[in-house]
Curated annotation (Swiss-Prot):
Keywords: ATP-binding, Cytoplasm, Cytoskeleton, Kinase, Nucleotide-binding, Nucleus, Phosphoprotein, Serine/threonine-protein kinase, Transferase, Tyrosine-protein kinase. It comes from the Eukaryota. The gene is map2k1. It is an enzyme of class 2 (transferase). Residues 68-363 form the Protein kinase domain. Residues 9-24 have a biased composition (Polar residues). This is Dual specificity mitogen-activated protein kinase kinase 1. It comes from Xenopus laevis.
Amino acid sequence: MPKKKPTPIQLNPNPEGTAVNGTPTAETNLEALQKKLEELELDEQQRKRLEAFLTQKQKVGELKDDDFEKVSELGAGNGGVVFKVSHKPTSLIMARKLIHLEIKPAIRNQIIRELQVLHECNSPYIVGFYGAFYSDGEISICMEHMDGGSLDQVLKKAGKIPEKILGKVSIAVIKGLTYLREKHKIMHRDVKPSNILVNSRGEIKLCDFGVSGQLIDSMANSFVGTRSYMSPERLQGTHYSVQSDIWSMGLSLVEMAIGRYPIPPPDAKELELIFGCSVERDPASSELAPRPRPPGRPISSYGPDSRPPMAIFELLDYIVNEPPPKLPSGVFGAEFQDFVNKCLVKNPAERADLKQLMVHSFIKQSELEEVDFAGWLCSTMGLKQPSTPTHAAGV
C-alpha cells in the first residue's frame, strides 16, 4: 500500500520564549525542525509520538540538578549509572545517566557542547534527548524513559528472544543506524543488546551512540567487561566505519537468538540444552570448536556452557582469528541465518552494508509480518500494556 503524504508536524512555539537547555526556541528553529521531521517518512502514529515528545520537551526549560528526584536505579554500565527520575517542574519521568569524570573545565564544556547534537537527533528509532548538564563532578545526560528497559534485561527474563521479535529489532536497528549516518554523519560505535531500548508501546530505539568524541576519549579507560561486540577490524586498530556497527548488530542478534553471548560457539551438547532438541551443527562449522582452554578463567558468558570460560584477551583473540559465530541450522529460518551471516563477515569490505540489509529477504519478510511486539514485551517483562501500542507491522 503506498504511503499517504504525512500531515505536517504541528509544534507550538514555547509561549514564554524561554530557552530549552540554552537553545533559543524561536519560530525559525521550529520551522527548521518541522521541515527535518517531514523528511523522515513517518507513519501517522510515529509522527504523533515524535510531536508529543517535542512538545513536552519545550516545557522542560533549562535542566538543573535540584529539579530531579530519584525514583529508582535502571542500570549501570558504559561508564555510568542510569536512574529513573522525576523532573519536578514538569512531573515528566526521564532516564538520567550520570557519568563521573575527573576532567578539566574546558574538556567538560566541550563534552556538553558536543552532546548538544543530540537535540537534533529526532527519529522513532533513537531514544529522545532532553538535555545534558554538568553538576558536582558528574555529567548528566537526560533521556526519554523506556519502560521495557534494554534488550539485555529482556533477554535475561526471556531466556531467548523469538526470531519474529528479532525481525522487528533488526528493522529498528537498521533504520536507527541509517538515520544517524544519513542525517548526522554519526556512527553508533557501541551497538549491543544493552544499548537497544524498548517500551510497552512496542517502540525499539538505539541509545548511547558516539556523538561526543571528547566523551569517548575521556571514558576510553573505563572499559571493564567480559564480552566484546567490537568488529575484528576495530579490535586490530585498523580503520573502521559504520560496517563495524553492522558486525556488532549481527553478534547481538545471535546472542539474543541463542540466549547467551555467542563466543565461543556452543557445542552440540549445549545447543541441545538450549533448544531442548537435537540441533544440526552446520557441516562447515564442525571444525570450529574452540581450542581447549585451561580451567578457572574469568566468566565471559552466561548460559549452560560446561567448558571453562574465556579470559577477555582470549576472547578478543578469538574474534580476530577464528571463524565468526553462526546461528545453528534447523532452529532458525534460512533467511534469518543468511542475514546474520552477511552481518558477520570478517572483512568489512565484504560485509553487507545498511542499504543491502534493508532489502534483504529477512527484513522484507519481517516488515510484512504482523507481530505484537508490545504484547510480547509486556507479558515477558510484567508490564501493563498501554491503550495505544505500536502496531509493529513494519515497526
